[in-house]
A protein has these predicted regions:
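Conserved glycine-rich Rossmann-like NAD(P)H-binding loop of the short-chain dehydrogenase/reductase
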Residues: 25-34
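Conserved Rossmann-fold NAD(P)-dependent oxidoreductase catalytic core, especially the SDR/UDP-sugar
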Residues: 88, 92-118
Length: 118
């Protein structure tokens, strides 16, 4: 099984990559992040992309599963950036996965999904 993980360099993403590296059912993992981390893991190759603006189709083509973990959680710092990543980014991930024919998509989100604000 080929898995693509968006937001792969975050806390949840790196924990998931470590688990996937030890899963015999997983043949390869693409860790997608805005910046490539130093972390090296078995079965994992890194790719850089911003889910809210970059082309995702090439990264998703041939994937069996996309796990979407790219989100921002601090609305007080930059609400527009949080909206762009959390809303626009998720819309783009869903569209790209559908267009690439990905069979399964797992989506987790942040507290930002509950519309935090003043």
């Amino acid at each position: 099984m080929r898995v693509v993980v968006t937001g792969a360099s975050g806390n949840v993403g790196t924990s998931l990559l470590k688990a996937l590296a030890g899963d015999p059912a997983v043949s390869s993992v693409v860790g997608l992040a805005r910046r490539r981390p130093e972390l090296e893991l078995a079965k994992t190759t890194w790719a850089t992309a911003d889910v809210a603006g970059d082309d995702l189709g090439g990264h998703f083509r041939g994937a069996d599963v996309v796990v979407h973990l790219a989100w921002l959680i601090q609305p007080s710092h930059d609400p527009f950036a949080m909206w762009r990543t959390n809303v626009v980014g998720t819309e783009r991930v869903l569209a790209a996965a559908a267009q690439a024919g990905v069979g399964a998509l797992v989506c987790a989100s942040s507290v930002g999904a509950y519309s935090p604000g003043p």
